[in-house]
Swiss-Prot record:
<keyword id="KW-0804">Transcription</keyword>
<comment type="subunit">
    <text>Component of the Mediator complex.</text>
</comment>
<keyword id="KW-0805">Transcription regulation</keyword>
<feature type="compositionally biased region" description="Low complexity">
    <location>
        <begin position="132"/>
        <end position="154"/>
    </location>
</feature>
<protein>
    <recommendedName>
        <fullName>Mediator of RNA polymerase II transcription subunit 30</fullName>
    </recommendedName>
</protein>
<feature type="compositionally biased region" description="Gly residues">
    <location>
        <begin position="158"/>
        <end position="169"/>
    </location>
</feature>
<dbReference type="GO" id="GO:0006357">
    <property type="term" value="P:regulation of transcription by RNA polymerase II"/>
</dbReference>
<feature type="region of interest" description="Disordered">
    <location>
        <begin position="109"/>
        <end position="176"/>
    </location>
</feature>
<comment type="similarity">
    <text>Belongs to the Mediator complex subunit 30 family.</text>
</comment>
<dbReference type="Pfam" id="PF11315">
    <property type="entry name" value="Med30"/>
</dbReference>
<dbReference type="InterPro" id="IPR021019">
    <property type="entry name" value="Mediator_Med30_met"/>
</dbReference>
<dbReference type="GO" id="GO:0003712">
    <property type="term" value="F:transcription coregulator activity"/>
</dbReference>
<feature type="region of interest" description="Disordered">
    <location>
        <begin position="1"/>
        <end position="26"/>
    </location>
</feature>
<comment type="function">
    <text>Component of the Mediator complex, a coactivator involved in the regulated transcription of nearly all RNA polymerase II-dependent genes. Mediator functions as a bridge to convey information from gene-specific regulatory proteins to the basal RNA polymerase II transcription machinery. Mediator is recruited to promoters by direct interactions with regulatory proteins and serves as a scaffold for the assembly of a functional preinitiation complex with RNA polymerase II and the general transcription factors.</text>
</comment>
<feature type="compositionally biased region" description="Low complexity">
    <location>
        <begin position="109"/>
        <end position="122"/>
    </location>
</feature>
<keyword id="KW-0010">Activator</keyword>
<dbReference type="GO" id="GO:0045893">
    <property type="term" value="P:positive regulation of DNA-templated transcription"/>
</dbReference>
């Protein structure tokens, strides 16, 4: 097989383009060479079997049988399927063939494997006119990209898992340095302040419970003392946070006005507004007054008539009584 690989390496320039003969002891296929791409597209089944021992010819026939009835055709952007086991399942063989053709190792993460599979055809197309250093540069760029992605993921995980006072300090910085392009929502600030006050109350409960568990002995527990100090440090930061929220809310709302100044208090009732008197209204009102005076006069006259009539009747009755006597 070593000799077979050498024969293929020597036949590379005849196909057109002269690539580097990267020999593989057990596979017999070259990785990069213009001879595989140019010419008539060299096929493994049509390789001349000169300078080959019968044992090597038999191994080549077995490889042709594994590749299919038409023989394995050399792919310009792939490495030959080396190391296929006859006892493997067809699916496993296909996966190994694809991985070997794309040049992806088995231990690579899926992101790098996908990147190399996408870059594989581009590398294969440029094999006839490109050399080995360009492929190495592309591989180095891919490795740098994958390293950057891993560093970003680690940084995100590290920044998201910082509990306690560090998270409170970050929130304080976010509140104290708001985005000028974003408007401050008073409702959200009020809700954040309410949550902060509840957090302060819960921290005080934890402090009281920790102080309650301390026993008045000569040997004090340093862990409890450190825990209480940490609680007080967190409470101090939370109070600063509440103060910042309070200042932001006061700046966003209008000035305070007393409620009594907004309510109009009046001791005396307002005078009634007189209706405008037109000429017709005045005439009717004057006629009404005249009618009232006329009625009063008639009433006085009727009263005088009644009084006179009563006196006359009284005199008539007196005269009749005097006559009978």
């Amino acid at each position: 097989m070593w000799k077979y690989g050498q024969n293929q390496g020597n036949q590379g320039p005849a196909g057109g383009g002269g690539g580097a003969p990267n020999m593989m002891p057990m596979g017999g296929f070259m990785q990069g060479g213009g001879g595989m791409q140019g010419g008539g597209g060299m096929q493994h089944g049509n390789m001349p079997q000169m300078h080959m021992t019968p044992q090597q010819q038999q191994q080549q026939q077995q490889m042709n049988m594994m590749g299919g009835p038409g023989g394995m055709q050399m792919n310009p952007n792939a490495v030959g399927p080396t190391g296929l086991m006859p006892g493997m399942s067809p699916q496993h063989q296909m996966q190994q063939q694809q991985q070997m053709m794309q040049g992806v190792p088995m231990s690579m993460p899926p992101q790098q494997a996908m990147q190399q599979q996408m870059m594989g055809p581009q590398q294969g197309l440029g094999m006839g006119g490109s050399s080995g250093p360009q492929q190495q540069q592309q591989l180095q760029q891919q490795q740098q990209q994958s390293n950057l992605q891993q560093q970003q993921q680690q940084h995100n995980v590290g920044s998201g898992g910082a509990p306690g006072a560090g998270g409170v300090g970050n929130n304080m910085l976010a509140i104290s340095q708001p985005n000028p392009h974003k408007e401050i929502n008073i409702v959200q600030l009020s809700r954040l302040g309410q949550e902060t006050v509840q957090d302060i109350a819960s921290r005080f409960q934890e402090v009281f419970s920790a102080l309650k568990n301390i026993q008045p002995t000569s040997h004090r527990d340093n862990n409890t003392e450190k825990k209480v100090q940490e609680y007080f440090r967190t409470i101090r930061l939370l109070f600063k946070r509440v103060r910042i929220i309070y200042d932001k809310c006061n700046d966003a709302v209008m000035d305070y006005m007393n409620a009594e100044s907004l309510i109009p208090y009046k001791d005396e009732p307002e005078p009634r507004i007189e209706t405008s008197q037109c000429d017709e209204y005045r005439k009717v009102l004057q006629e009404n007054h005249e009618y009232i005076e006329t009625v009063k006069l008639k009433n006085r006259q009727l009263r005088e008539i009644i009084d006179r009539t009563r006196i006359i009747i009284w005199e008539i009755n007196t005269m009749l009584a005097m006559r009978r006597s």
